[in-house]
Amino acid sequence: MAIVKVKPTSPGRRAMVKVVNKNLHQGKPFAALLDSQSSTAGRNNNGRITTRHKGGGHKQHYRIVDFRRTKDGIPAKVERLEYDPNRSANIALVLYADGERRYIIAPKGLTVGQQLMSGSEAPIRAGNTLPIRNIPVGTTIHCIEMLPGKGAQMARSAGTSAMLLAREGVYAQVRLRSGEIRRVHIECRATVGEVGNEEHSLRQIGKAGANRWRGIRPTVRGVAMNPVDHPHGGGEGKTAAGRDPVSPWGTPAKGYRTRSNKRTTTMIVQRRHKR
């Protein structure tokens, strides 16, 4: 993997920085693990915008990634590493001994030909998936389940990981990359190691068009709008917002907590804001 500063042949390429990985598969993805997905452009079933700044972008196939890793005791061989347009991490196509192929999130250091295993008897090695009760305290993990059997939901982005801090009864304590310490049931599964493609955060888009390829539309400042469109809008000429920063619906935009899921609050040992 290499960081490449693009030759400045145009203003759009002058600031562009790419992450190049020559180990990624250059051909087509595995067709049996592809699914079609239509672009919603941020609209719901009523056609109304529910997520702003979305629309356009290149057409993509969804790669069906195995987040459960439930084929216990069956060794798998890494056939190739692939780019996935739907996520920041790369994915790996693995071939199980029974002939089935699946995509998984590619951990850091994974190589073609490497053997992987899942289940409680799997060795503690990067890429292997085990129940948390079988993982030693202090191990770096990723792709962590929040409910047993539901599939990995935490620490799935490029370069992310978590640390297994302790086990108390039927729960374990995991410190996430944000600094939050969270309780997770010991029957939940996690994968050893950290997610690969850690240099993803070093890339520079370089030009607005590159974001349009990704389906990201421009973000207009509130002070540039009319009063009917935003609380910061209006005024004669260029004027300040006149109040603390808020969203278009009046919610404070800087540091205001909006989490409302009280049902799982007991699972958070330490908030990420209280480091």
Swiss-Prot record:
Entry keyword RNA-binding: yes
Alphabetical list of PROSITE patterns matching this protein: RIBOSOMAL_L2 (PS00467)
The entry's keywords: Ribonucleoprotein, Ribosomal protein, RNA-binding, rRNA-binding
GO terms for biological process, alphabetical: cytoplasmic translation
GO-annotated molecular function: rRNA binding; structural constituent of ribosome; transferase activity
Region (Disordered): 35-59, 224-275
Gene3D superfamilies: 2.30.30.30, Nucleic acid-binding proteins, Ribosomal protein L2, domain 3
GO CC annotations on file: large ribosomal subunit
InterPro entries per record: NA-bd_OB-fold, Rib_uL2_dom2, Ribosomal_uL2, Ribosomal_uL2_bac/org-type, Ribosomal_uL2_C, Ribosomal_uL2_CS, Ribosomal_uL2_dom3, Ribosomal_uL2_RNA-bd_dom
Domain of life according to the entry: Bacteria
Stored SMART domains: Ribosomal_L2, Ribosomal_L2_C
Family, per entry: Belongs to the universal ribosomal protein uL2 family.
Complex formation: Part of the 50S ribosomal subunit. Forms a bridge to the 30S subunit in the 70S ribosome.
This protein's name: Large ribosomal subunit protein uL2
